[in-house]
């Protein structure tokens, strides 16, 4: 039985209400819409969530949103055993918050990739500002390979469709110690290809740290239509997978399960309660309206996310994998 949850409609959300649950026309068209969405909305993401565009993981009720977001990174580090001074490929890096954290805190050499031109621009700007402050300089410039020194590590950002990462990094010969992907794989039309490419770019013994959104197993048609389809529509997602679906695809791609899946839905759901309260700003809804249906559907899908968590139909989990052959 579906749990009762306040839909929390407001005068703003009612004013801009739009039906959700439409299917996507083609996967290429969906990818184009995803790129456009992040190019247009990333400045708003920064204002809403800060530099970490992902869920928070609350270990206790007193923690702030920002502390909870760092908690999620630390949880992924624990289950994946990604160590200090690792070479990391951060797939779907957003505006670079995790990449900078891994570089400055663990001394990692991090390459962040995103399909969004705007996100690369913002990530570079934030990284240079942090590096200049860290080095007590007015300005810093990247090295010949595009890396900016940050703490004990360094980081760079590349605009790249993640489905092409296997070929793009082929010349490196599987040189990454870790691949990191947080809340990005759910956007990918070809998830099997991601795991195959991860196998290609990892060195033997390399780790994959993964956090993502999932649909629950064995959903009724009613639950799927009420809870999952609106999320797929508003969040620009191809058909969602189950947690076991990712495990199966990873194994088919040559990876071994290291830890998980660990369902942390109850510990992250608060993210959307906070977010719903943050978006009650007329200018944000007006901006979304100016972007057409996708902009409004995105904001309206926040309610579906909250409902899905409450009903147990929508889940959040972390998983880690390993490429066989390490010492």
Label each region the model flagged.
Residues 2-47:
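N-terminal auxiliary segments of SAM/dcSAM-dependent transferases
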Residues 221-316, 322-325:
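Substrate-binding/catalytic lobe of Class I Rossmann-like enzymes that use SAM or dcSAM, i.e.
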Residues 192-207:
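A short glycine-rich, Lys/Arg-flanked "PGG" loop and its adjoining helix->strand segment in the class I
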Residues 52, 59, 63-86:
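Conserved alpha-helix/loop element of class I SAM-dependent methyltransferases that forms part
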Residues 95:
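Conserved SAM/SAH-binding loop
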Residues 87-89, 98-164:
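Class I SAM-dependent methyltransferase SAM/SAH-binding core
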Residues 164-179:
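A short acidic, Gly/Pro-enriched loop at the edge of an enzyme's catalytic core
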Residues 210-212:
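Acidic carboxylate diad motif detector
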């Amino acid at each position: 039985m579906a749990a009762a949850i306040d839909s929390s409609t407001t005068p703003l959300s009612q004013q801009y209400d739009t039906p959700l649950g439409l299917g996507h026309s083609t996967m290429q068209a969906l990818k184009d819409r995803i790129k456009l969405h992040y190019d247009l909305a990333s400045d708003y993401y920064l204002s809403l969530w800060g530099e970490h565009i992902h869920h928070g993981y609350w270990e206790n009720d007193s923690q702030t949103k920002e502390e909870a977001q760092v908690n999620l990174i630390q949880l992924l580090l624990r289950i994946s055993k990604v160590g200090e001074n690792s070479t990391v490929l951060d797939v779907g890096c957003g505006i670079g918050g995790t990449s900078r954290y891994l570089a400055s805190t663990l001394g990692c050499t991090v390459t962040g990739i995103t399909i969004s031109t705007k996100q690369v621009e913002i990530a570079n700007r934030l990284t240079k500002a942090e590096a200049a402050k860290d080095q007590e300089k007015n300005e810093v410039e990247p090295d010949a390979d595009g890396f900016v020194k940050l703490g004990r590590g360094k980081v760079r950002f590349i605009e790249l469709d993640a489905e092409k990462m296997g070929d793009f990094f082929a010349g490196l010969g599987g040189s990454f110690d870790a691949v990191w992907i947080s809340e990005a794989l759910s956007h990918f039309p070809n998830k099997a290809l991601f795991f195959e490419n991860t196998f290609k770019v990892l060195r033997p013994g390399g780790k994959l740290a993964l956090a993502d959104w999932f649909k629950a197993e064995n959903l009724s048609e009613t639950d799927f239509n009420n809870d999952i389809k609106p999320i797929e529509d508003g969040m620009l997602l191809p058909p969602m997978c189950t947690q076991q679906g990712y495990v199966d695809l990873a194994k088919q791609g040559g990876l071994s399960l290291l830890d998980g899946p660990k369902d942390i839905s109850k510990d992250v759901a608060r993210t959307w309660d906070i977010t719903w309260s943050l978006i009650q700003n007329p200018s944000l809804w007006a901006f979304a309206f100016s972007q057409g249906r996708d902009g409004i559907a995105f904001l309206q899908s926040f309610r579906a996310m909250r409902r899905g968590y409450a009903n147990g139909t929508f889940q959040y989990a972390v998983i880690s994998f390993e490429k066989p052959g390490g010492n």
